[in-house]
């Protein structure tokens, strides 16, 4: 395209889909073999209290690792960036009021949803499916909120493929404990995904559906995250943790839904054992059962979506094990173990011997940041092939990420710093 030719978004989307189909048919490309080399990390309030400083530090860190992401020739389309935060109740209560409802004191749940932008009928169909599944369990829907976005922060190609971005806000009974509420939402989301797919709607994706946390992400540059999502600049948007990610696609077609963080983790690296891990997961599904899923076990199969990238597949299995009742550190230990001689007599060796008998390791260069429940963690692969640095401040913040110095911290406030691995 010459400099005086106008960008045609419809033609671009069509040619992109045709190119992807040709490459898949020729065996030159498969979505399942997508890998990334990215920037990743988290910020956490050590005492668990929500703070604006956590959000500000995470935004600063994300914007500092812009060089770890790719930039399209248009100069503004990125491979993807995003941030995962706890839900700020006060922020959403004021938006619930704008729907004509008042906060009923129940568990507030929020879903961040990508809808087909150019098909109004499909949009409404998706909303109906989402509401039906939420209402089926007796929850009260406050309404939908159109997320404010500034499309001027996007490049031509990101704009051409941009979804309609909305949030569904609803209330769950306070009598539900947090774990059961999250498990219900997991099953609801999986049923929604299947129902939408059955209607042959492909441009639909739920970034997050939770009473705990919410994910803002997209196909923009890291430094544009707050420009595109002005919500993140609201001083009422506070959080006790933030997981952030800047994507660099090494062999992929960047898409909005493949931007990270995913629902549990943000991942820098690649899973070299992906095909074997996926095959083993399919085998496990045949005998998979758990009392907490009971008759709904088939709603969550297949665990790994067809065509999922390595990071998305890893996230899906992480999520399953967590929803089954395991803790986040334990799931990381099972799936991305450290190098260990399991034939030894130490308690740690016996732990890893047990883990190896339960779950095949997902191996390859990796650094992850993840959140679930009361945990936020960072970790690396057994060979330490992806970096992860951390800083603990005297004012109670823990900052971890791919590089040192992503967040400016006065030296007098550094209690401890170092590296993982």
Regions found by a protein language model. Name each.
Residues 2-421:
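Conserved short alpha-helical segments that host acidic/polar catalytic motifs at enzyme active sites
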